A protein has these predicted regions:
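All-alpha amphipathic helical-bundle segments outside canonical DNA-binding/catalytic cores
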Residues: 117-118, 248-260
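Active-site activation/catalytic loop segments of kinase-like enzymes and analogous catalytic loops
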Residues: 200-245, 259-278
């Protein structure tokens, strides 16, 4: 992740987000892309902070950075959102669904993001990118990852032409919530955003909710009774998204889920490698490598048993 700082000045409060120091993997930590996408979304139905300035001069603080608005609100880390009641939880999940559908309905030409990524063949390109990054940061042999990569290569659906702006890390704790209302005031952490397939974002969020409850930053709802919490089932959440976007049916759902597990595992491997090399921004980074194998195993279980 990119180191983030809260700045208090005479003129107000701001947030500075910069690239981490040290040697970086190619295309990782693109704070300039984060700045560009949030700036482009200012007047859309996707809530984002106001952007102030991107500094590409690495001599100022040691790496590229940008300054954005400080949003006063709430961040929730636990997918079960124990801090609120059932009615609020139901409303919050519906709000996340609404914002995701709004994001995928953004006219990328109108907001100046038509060249923000390569349109088409998203999963093929992503498989290439994350397989390469996984190999570059591989520390030891993990058979489940080998099996998963082989399955994804052999079961990739034909490109259906769907292209939208995708966030790339769309989940509860990457949103700033209104101080009292079940309303998103800012979607944050856009470093993985690009032009891609909208179902990648939807499957990624659903994948996260399949995680164990004690998944650290990736705490999910595995084993929890969603109904008793006022949280929709995966099927209900997907259905609500489809209704918002006028989609009849989703084919190949198990592929999209399995791909999400793979990509997250590849990202985790990169974090673990940076920790080993001494470049990670979080003290917890070294432990992240331990999730790679379980993620690949969960994906293979979906593949074997169906979504």
């Amino acid at each position: 992740s990119n180191p983030t700082f809260h700045i208090k000045a005479a003129s107000g409060e701001y947030v500075l987000r910069r690239q981490p120091p040290g040697k970086l993997l190619k295309s990782a930590h693109a704070v300039d892309r984060e700045f560009r996408v949030m700036n482009a979304l200012q007047n859309t139905d996707v809530p984002v902070p106001r952007m102030y300035h991107l500094c590409e001069d690495r001599d100022v603080v040691g790496s590229m950075f940008y300054i954005m608005e400080f949003c006063q609100g709430r961040i929730f880390w636990d997918a079960a959102i124990p801090e609120v009641d059932n009615a609020q939880r139901t409303a919050m999940y519906d709000e996340m669904n609404r914002v995701l559908a709004a994001l995928h309905d953004v006219d990328v030409d109108a907001v100046g993001l038509a060249d923000y990524g390569k349109p088409g063949n998203y999963f093929e390109r992503q498989m290439g990118r994350w397989s390469k990054q996984y190999r570059a940061s591989e520390i030891n042999h993990i058979q489940a990852m080998e099996d998963l990569m082989a399955w994804l290569e052999n079961n990739q659906p034909a490109d259906d032409g769907q292209v939208s702006l995708v966030h790339g890390d769309y989940r509860l704790d990457n949103m700033m919530w209104h101080p009292t209302e079940p309303r998103v005031i800012a979607v944050l952490d856009w470093e993985l955003s690009t032009l891609g397939h909208p179902l990648a974002d939807l499957a990624y969020q659903c994948m996260q909710l399949r995680m164990p409850q004690e998944g650290g930053n990736l705490s999910g709802l595995q084993g929890k009774d969603r109904k008793s919490l006022g949280i929709p089932t995966e099927q209900e959440y997907v259905q609500a998204y489809c209704e918002r976007r006028g989609i009849d049916h989703i084919d190949h759902w198990e592929f999209y889920l399995a791909f999400s597990f793979f990509r997250l595992a590849a990202i985790a491997q990169g974090v673990a490698k940076r920790a080993q090399d001494g470049n990670a921004s979080s003290k917890k980074a070294a432990a992240v490598g331990q999730v790679v194998e379980p993620l690949a195993q969960m994906a293979m279980q979906i593949v074997r048993e169906g979504a």
